[in-house]
Amino acid sequence: MPTALITGASAGLGAEFARQLAAKGADLVLVARGTDALNVLAGELRTQHGVAVEVLAADLGQESDVTRVAERIADAGHPIDLLVNNAGFGLPLQFADNDIEDEVRHLRVHVEASMRLMHAGIRAMRGRGGRIINVASVAGFISRSTYSACKSWLIGFSRWANAEYSRDGVSVTAVCPGFTHTSFHARMGLSPGHEGVPGPMWLDAADVVREGLRDAARGKSVSIPSLRYKVIVALSRVLPSSLTAGVARRGRV
């Protein structure tokens, strides 16, 4: 059976990727900082789907932990067929108001860790084939502080890597959701209903993951789940940035 390694797997989109992949029969390696939620999810998936689930506790803001995850990806004896780079977090304040160390950690998790794990994944997969999904954001198409900058990098690098390594059997897809019902905003201190986001703009995590997996299977370099956000991205290319920046003001759109 194929094996998928998912970072940020304890909740939100990461957990939903795990559920949908397990339902398809994939064995899993679940990565997140804490093991309690991972162990609960792992038990659920083993029971419901009969798949093998490995739990790997790692803080992707720490270089040593990123190295451990990269080594697991590189393990030829237990190959990874699909890497889902999903780990990430938002910061509650504007750039100048955040502690600079928080901003640096934010950059490490979103960009450096994703790059290191992609490097390990591509090296392990090229020739035999494999797939990488980078969970980016619609915010990557809209100028807004470091969150958008990180996601923009991830989108651009995914596009290049997909074109470069598809000839070696490795596809790379940036999945770019808009506002999605997960615990992301709550971890930023925004309680449900107080995110400042109109109801019609919210997406369901299951729909985001379903469309992302479908687009990745088709070899697309960028996946933008839902028609409404496809329209927003199209408009962002032609409208002044001052009009589109507000769409991303809460971080993960």
Task: Give the positions of each predicted feature.
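Residue(s) in the substrate-gating loop at a strand-loop-helix junction
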Residues: 137
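Conserved glycine-rich Rossmann-like NAD(P)H-binding loop of the short-chain dehydrogenase/reductase
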Residues: 24-41
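Conserved NAD(P)H cofactor-binding loop of Rossmann-fold oxidoreductase domains
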Residues: 86-91
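Conserved glycine-rich cofactor-binding loop
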Residues: 10-11
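Active-site helix of classical SDR
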Residues: 118, 150-153
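Substrate-binding pocket helix/loop in short-chain dehydrogenase/reductase
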Residues: 94-96, 102-107
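C-terminal helical subdomain
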Residues: 174, 195-232
